């Protein structure tokens, strides 16, 4: 999903806008030179000294202004997203609206999240204060060029931290547009800085004494590398990594509605979402009909120009992404998986993979264990909820999941048994500003969004006050 700070067998791609629908390289951008990095970090540190001292209400007002500007620039920003990573234009506009809602949420609610929390004590007073930490590095992916950045940057800017952004090399113009938007809203120079970093220079940033933490949304491999660097340099980190989310169907009053939800949960953003419904688990008595209808639904998604409002299936983010996904699909086919729909690259220019439904996937196949980052669904037959839970929890990932049942008590019972950070009932796993987002196991740690995301990079400082004549108690610790 995002570039890994670890050495790769593939050559490092430059920051460039490459239209995944046409293959055209629209614009390239030079890497930041290593020698330039320390000055930019020091500028961010100096900005923190001033930005962090401003009243939180002032910082929050700037976030609300950023939300207004984002909505005003919807067409421009959405067009950039579609150009750079191939998202359907209507979905790109939805991403802009979601990102703006996050900016506005922290602009409105942020100050209350930072209010001191008093602790009842026998004598005197005790409170926990929420203070900023300083300069933070965000490493963000291409699949949601605005939303992913904003869910990290907005709460931390309101807290009083300053932000350095290393965005994906696939969406440099989106990165620059967001930087300009923050500055136009009133975020001072240095408080939010886009960096076109080489992978090899990420450690230099994390290691710098002024940098207090790092947040990464990306692949498992990238997360492991960043966690290693953060640990080596004793920096706080938050990781939102891959997912292979279960979508469990226990019963259905309206099977068509459930199938539609499964298709939406799998094919939104051409399937390039960490929380997409990648592993579908359906009970015996519904399985055959569910698979048949899902295959028909997937087959109706025809590739086309993502900027055309009538298009239902956009390209993947790059030709390399399409080749990688097709290799996973072909591995499953070669080893005996059944293709219900799709299974091939369409005869259409662009980075497309046919919407694919696979069954009879077994543990010797890559598709059983690996995240499929594109429009491919794997459907499993299960006897009952116990088998569904066991299969769901057999994954090394633990990001999100969905449970569908007309019996809400039953669905709730299953949800509580899933080893994931999020579970949605009778709805595909999704995201909203006021709901915490994050996973467990190899899907990462820490939370973004809601009040929980706002407090990740704060100094939760205890202040304990005694009357002046209080006799000191025995000290321990």
UniProtKB/Swiss-Prot annotation:
Record EC number: 1.2.1.79
Coiled-coil intervals: none
Molecular function, one GO term: succinate-semialdehyde dehydrogenase (NAD+) activity
Catalytic activity from the UniProt record: succinate semialdehyde + NADP(+) + H2O = succinate + NADPH + 2 H(+)
Keywords: NADP, Oxidoreductase
Keyword Magnesium: no
GO biological processes: gamma-aminobutyric acid catabolic process
Keyword Oxidoreductase assigned: yes
Active-site residues, record numbering mapped to chain: 240 (proton acceptor), 274 (nucleophile)
Binding site residues for NADP(+): 142-143, 166-169, 218-219, 241, 371
UniProt cross-references to InterPro entries, sorted A to Z: Ald_DH/histidinol_DH (IPR016161), Ald_DH_C (IPR016163), Ald_DH_CS_CYS (IPR016160), Ald_DH_N (IPR016162), Aldehyde_DH_dom (IPR015590), ALDH_GabD1-like (IPR044148), GABD/Sad-like (IPR047110)
Top-level taxon: Bacteria
Pathway: Amino-acid degradation; 4-aminobutanoate degradation
Function (record text): Catalyzes the NADP(+) dependent oxidation of succinate semialdehyde to succinate.
Family of the protein in this entry: Belongs to the aldehyde dehydrogenase family.
Identification of the protein by name: Succinate-semialdehyde dehydrogenase [NADP(+)]
């Amino acid at each position: 999903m995002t570039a890994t700070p670890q050495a790769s067998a593939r050559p490092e791609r430059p920051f460039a806008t490459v239209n995944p629908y046409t293959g055209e390289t629209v614009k390239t951008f030079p890497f930041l030179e290593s020698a330039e990095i320390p000055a930019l970090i020091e500028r961010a540190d100096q900005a923190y000294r001033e930005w962090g001292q401003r009243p939180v209400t002032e910082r929050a007002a700037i976030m609300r202004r950023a939300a207004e500007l984002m909505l005003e620039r919807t067409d421009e920003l959405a067009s950039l997203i579609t150009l750079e990573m191939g998202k359907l234009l209507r979905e790109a506009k939805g991403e802009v609206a979601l990102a703006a809602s996050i900016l506005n949420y922290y602009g409105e609610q942020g100050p209350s999240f930072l209010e001191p929390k008093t602790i009842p004590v026998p004598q005197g007073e005790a409170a926990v204060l929420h203070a900023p930490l300083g300069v933070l590095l965000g490493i963000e992916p291409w699949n949601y060029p605005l939303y992913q950045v904003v869910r990290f940057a907005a709460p931390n800017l309101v807290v009083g931290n300053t932000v350095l952004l290393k965005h994906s090399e696939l969406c440099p113009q989106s990165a620059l547009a967001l930087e300009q938007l923050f500055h136009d809203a009133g975020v001072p120079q240095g408080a939010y800085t886009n960096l076109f970093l080489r992978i090899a220079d990420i450690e230099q940033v994390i290691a710098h004494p002024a940098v207090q933490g790092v947040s990464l949304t990306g692949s498992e491999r990238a997360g492991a590398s960043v966690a290693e660097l953060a640990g080596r340099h004793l920096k706080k980190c938050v990781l939102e990594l891959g997912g292979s989310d279960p979508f469990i169907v226990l019963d259905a009053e309206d099977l068509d509605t459930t199938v539609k939800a499964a298709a939406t949960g799998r094919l939104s953003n051409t399937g390039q979402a960490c929380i997409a419904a990648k592993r579908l688990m359906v009970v015996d008595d519904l399985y055959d009909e569910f698979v048949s209808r899902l295959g028909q639904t997937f087959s109706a998604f025809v590739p086309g120009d993502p900027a055309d409002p009538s298009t239902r299936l956009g390209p993947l983010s790059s030709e390399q992404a399409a080749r990688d996904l097709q290799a996973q699909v072909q591995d499953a086919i070669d080893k005996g998986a059944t293709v219900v729909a799709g299974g091939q690259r369409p005869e259409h220019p662009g980075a497309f993979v046919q919407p694919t439904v696979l069954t009879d996937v077994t543990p010797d196949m890559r598709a059983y264990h690996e995240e499929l980052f594109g429009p491919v669904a794997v459907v499993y037959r299960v006897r009952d909820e116990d088998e569904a839970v066991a299969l769901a929890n057999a994954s090394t990932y633990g990001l999100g999941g969905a449970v569908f049942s007309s019996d809400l008590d039953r669905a709730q019972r299953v949800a509580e048994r899933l080893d994931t950070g999020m579970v949605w009932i009778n709805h595909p796993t999704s995201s909203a500003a006021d709901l915490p987002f994050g996973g467990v196991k190899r899907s990462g740690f820490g939370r973004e969004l809601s009040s929980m995301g706002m407090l990740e990079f704060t100094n939760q400082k205890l202040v304990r006050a005694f009357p002046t004549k209080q006799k000191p108690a025995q000290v321990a610790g």
